[in-house]
C-alpha cells in the first residue's frame, strides 16, 4: 500500500504544476471512480448514495459522496486542503530584453523561499484565455520542457553572498528564456498562441490574457539511503489533496463525505474560490436548502483541515518548542494554537487522536514556540464561515515553501489510513 500510494503521489505531482492542473488531475481521478460533475449554473438533482463534484475557477474543487443516511442524523465528514503553492507568476506585460536576452517579469505568489529558485531548470504552465472564431475560450497549457532559468551571480562578483543575501524580486528574479538578436522583438502572447497550437492543435486568433506560473521541471523522487523521504515541489499542499482524495475513494461509508480543495490559501484565501469565499457554504446549502436542516447538519459535522506541518529540522531544532518537535515518518501532526491560528480544540483533537489510536497510526502534536509567530490554514476560516467543528492536522515536512520540499515516505500511508477511518466513522463527537 505504501509504495503504491507514494508512486501515485509522484505521478499526481508531475501532472499538477499549477492549481488549474491539480484540479484537472483531481477531476480525472474522480470521474474514473464514477463521480459526476455538477454545474453551479444549473439546478441540481442529487440522490442519496450519489457521487458528485463541483469546480470553481478551474482551480478549486469540492467532491461529495452523498450518504444513504441523512446528514441530519450523522452529519457530514469533511476534509479540507488547498491546491496552490508559492511560485513565480508571469506579469501581464512581461517581456524584458536586456543584454541580448529575452526575460519575463514575474510577481512572487505567496510566501516563497526565493533563493532555491536560482539555477533551476524551469518550465511554464497555467491557464490561457483567447479568442477563436469570435468566441472567448480558455485552455490549460504546460510547456513541460525546461525553457527558462534564473542564473545566480558568480561569487566572484558577489563576495558577501554567503553572509546573507537580500533578493530583490523585481530585478533579480526575471528568468532568462532565450538569446535574441539586436533589434528582434519577441511577443510573449504570440509564443502562447504557438503553444496552444502545439499542445492542443487549436488555432487561436489572439491570446487575450493568462495566469501562468514557472515551476521546477525536476520530477518528484524517493530519496535517502533507505528511501525514507520524498523530495518534490508543491508538497504543500498537494500532499494533503492527494491523501484526501485517496481516503474519499476508499471510503465505503453510508455517511455523507466531502473533500474540498481550495485555491488561494497561500495569499489569504479571500477570493470567490478560496476558503474565505462562499464556495463550500453555497455548495452545502444547495444540498441542504432548508435553513434549519442546514444548521442542524453542520452542528453534527466535523472538518479535518489538512495542511503540512513543520518537521523538526536537525540543523535548526531550536526553532521548535522543545516538547513539540514533529518528526518525519512519525505520523500526522495535530496543530494547536490557543490564539485560534489553528481551529483545533480539545474535543476535535481528542477525536482525531482516538481515530489514530484505533487505526494504529502514530500521531504527534505541534505548537509554535511562545516567542514566535504562528502561521494559519483554511481551518479557522472554514470553521468561522460554517460554524463547523474543526481539527487542524498535517504531515511534517522540511523546507516548506521552497521550490523543492521534503516529507517522509511512510507518512502518506499514515494519513490516508486515518482519513479513510474518519470518512468511515459512524459517530462524530
UniProtKB/Swiss-Prot annotation:
Q: E.C. number, please?
A: 3.4.11.-
Record InterPro entries? M18_aminopeptidase_2, Peptidase_M18, Peptidase_M18_dom2
Gene3D superfamilies xrefs: Aminopeptidase i, Domain 2, Zn peptidases
* Superkingdom as given in the UniProt entry: Bacteria
User: Which Pfam families does the record cross-reference, listed alphabetically?
Assistant: Peptidase_M18
Entry keyword Ion transport: no
This entry's Gene Ontology molecular function terms read:
aminopeptidase activity; metallopeptidase activity; zinc ion binding
In this chain, Zn(2+) is annotated as bound at 82, 156, 401
Q: Which cofactor does it need?
A: Zn(2+)
GO cellular component, alphabetical, reads: cytoplasm
GO biological process assignments: proteolysis
Q: What keywords would UniProt list here?
A: Aminopeptidase, Hydrolase, Metal-binding, Metalloprotease, Protease, Zinc
Has UniProt tagged this entry with the keyword Glycosyltransferase?
Answer: no
> HAMAP family of this UniProt entry?
Aminopeptidase_M18_2
Family assignment? Belongs to the peptidase M18 family.
Q: What is this protein called?
A: Probable M18 family aminopeptidase 2
